[in-house]
């Protein structure tokens, strides 16, 4: 089962990716992890990626596709894989298709922007332990304090409203067009496309995914 997850940052993809991986026994493929592994391994592709990144440039689509092809040929991808964060653009989706990387399901996590802002901006973390709270959905017993240690909770830099809104603008400009792209691919019979209501509680979203994926 080969799956692509689409949806804005904060739409709940990460939580459900864990569930899909465990239930269907497939690995999650992150392009960031692949790039780091390639650079560390010192492979030919890794050297190319390192040179580009050291120059402060973005790694080319061709290079990322080559890494994806290599990664999905590995034994743990025999039953499929889960792609999150790639493709991000229509040219990347086209390049995947041309490289013969077919996908069984494209799942779009649909959550309104304002709810995403609410979800992310309300996060508070206890950095030493990694415990995460939310001022509205999962508040600590004492406001601003960790339940276990009583230490101060902080807000991640990435969770500040200005940063979140900027990421949402980027998502709508670059990645949202993929929704139309994969809807057409599904109409042509090349993949299955499903929209998931990401505003529902985690357990309900999970149940919806089980119905879709079988």
Swiss-Prot record:
<feature type="binding site">
    <location>
        <begin position="10"/>
        <end position="15"/>
    </location>
    <ligand>
        <name>ATP</name>
    </ligand>
</feature>
<feature type="binding site">
    <location>
        <begin position="132"/>
        <end position="133"/>
    </location>
    <ligand>
        <name>ATP</name>
    </ligand>
</feature>
<dbReference type="GO" id="GO:0005737">
    <property type="term" value="C:cytoplasm"/>
</dbReference>
<feature type="binding site">
    <location>
        <position position="200"/>
    </location>
    <ligand>
        <name>ATP</name>
    </ligand>
</feature>
<feature type="binding site">
    <location>
        <begin position="57"/>
        <end position="59"/>
    </location>
    <ligand>
        <name>AMP</name>
    </ligand>
</feature>
<feature type="binding site">
    <location>
        <position position="92"/>
    </location>
    <ligand>
        <name>AMP</name>
    </ligand>
</feature>
<feature type="binding site">
    <location>
        <position position="167"/>
    </location>
    <ligand>
        <name>AMP</name>
    </ligand>
</feature>
<keyword id="KW-0547">Nucleotide-binding</keyword>
<keyword id="KW-0808">Transferase</keyword>
<feature type="binding site">
    <location>
        <position position="36"/>
    </location>
    <ligand>
        <name>AMP</name>
    </ligand>
</feature>
<feature type="region of interest" description="NMP">
    <location>
        <begin position="30"/>
        <end position="59"/>
    </location>
</feature>
<comment type="function">
    <text>Catalyzes the reversible transfer of the terminal phosphate group between ATP and AMP. Plays an important role in cellular energy homeostasis and in adenine nucleotide metabolism.</text>
</comment>
<dbReference type="GO" id="GO:0004017">
    <property type="term" value="F:adenylate kinase activity"/>
</dbReference>
<feature type="binding site">
    <location>
        <position position="31"/>
    </location>
    <ligand>
        <name>AMP</name>
    </ligand>
</feature>
<feature type="binding site">
    <location>
        <begin position="85"/>
        <end position="88"/>
    </location>
    <ligand>
        <name>AMP</name>
    </ligand>
</feature>
<dbReference type="Pfam" id="PF05191">
    <property type="entry name" value="ADK_lid"/>
</dbReference>
<protein>
    <recommendedName>
        <fullName>Adenylate kinase</fullName>
        <ecNumber>2.7.4.3</ecNumber>
    </recommendedName>
</protein>
<keyword id="KW-0963">Cytoplasm</keyword>
<feature type="region of interest" description="LID">
    <location>
        <begin position="122"/>
        <end position="159"/>
    </location>
</feature>
<comment type="subunit">
    <text>Monomer.</text>
</comment>
<feature type="modified residue" description="N6-acetyllysine">
    <location>
        <position position="192"/>
    </location>
</feature>
<comment type="pathway">
    <text>Purine metabolism; AMP biosynthesis via salvage pathway; AMP from ADP: step 1/1.</text>
</comment>
<dbReference type="Pfam" id="PF00406">
    <property type="entry name" value="ADK"/>
</dbReference>
<comment type="similarity">
    <text>Belongs to the adenylate kinase family.</text>
</comment>
<dbReference type="InterPro" id="IPR033690">
    <property type="entry name" value="Adenylat_kinase_CS"/>
</dbReference>
<dbReference type="GO" id="GO:0005524">
    <property type="term" value="F:ATP binding"/>
</dbReference>
<feature type="binding site">
    <location>
        <position position="156"/>
    </location>
    <ligand>
        <name>AMP</name>
    </ligand>
</feature>
<feature type="binding site">
    <location>
        <position position="123"/>
    </location>
    <ligand>
        <name>ATP</name>
    </ligand>
</feature>
<keyword id="KW-0545">Nucleotide biosynthesis</keyword>
<keyword id="KW-0418">Kinase</keyword>
<keyword id="KW-0007">Acetylation</keyword>
<dbReference type="InterPro" id="IPR027417">
    <property type="entry name" value="P-loop_NTPase"/>
</dbReference>
<dbReference type="InterPro" id="IPR007862">
    <property type="entry name" value="Adenylate_kinase_lid-dom"/>
</dbReference>
<dbReference type="InterPro" id="IPR000850">
    <property type="entry name" value="Adenylat/UMP-CMP_kin"/>
</dbReference>
<dbReference type="GO" id="GO:0044209">
    <property type="term" value="P:AMP salvage"/>
</dbReference>
<dbReference type="InterPro" id="IPR006259">
    <property type="entry name" value="Adenyl_kin_sub"/>
</dbReference>
<keyword id="KW-0067">ATP-binding</keyword>
């Amino acid at each position: 089962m080969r799956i692509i997850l689409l949806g804005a940052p904060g739409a709940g993809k990460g939580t459900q990716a864990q569930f899909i991986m465990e239930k269907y026994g497939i690995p999650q493929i992150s392009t960031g992890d692949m790039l780091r592994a390639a650079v560390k391994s010192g492979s030919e592709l890794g050297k190319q990626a390192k040179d580009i990144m050291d120059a402060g440039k973005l790694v080319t689509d061709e290079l990322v596709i080559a890494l994806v092809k290599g990664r999905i040929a590995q034994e743990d991808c025999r039953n499929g894989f889960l792609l999150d964060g790639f493709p991000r653009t229509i040219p990347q989706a086209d390049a995947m298709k041309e490289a013969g990387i077919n996908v069984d399901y494209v799942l779009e996590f649909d959550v309104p922007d304002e709810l995403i802002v609410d979800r992310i901006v309300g996060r508070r973390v206890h950095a030493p332990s990694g415990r995460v709270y939310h001022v509205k959905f999962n508040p600590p017993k004492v406001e601003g304090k960790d339940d276990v240690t009583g230490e101060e909770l902080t807000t991640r830099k990435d969770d500040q409203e200005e940063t979140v809104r900027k990421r949402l603008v980027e998502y709508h400009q670059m990645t949202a067009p993929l929704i139309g792209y994969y809807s057409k691919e599904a109409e042509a019979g090349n993949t299955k496309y499903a929209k998931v209501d990401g505003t529902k509680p985690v357990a309900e979203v999970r149940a919806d995914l089980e119905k879709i994926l079988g």
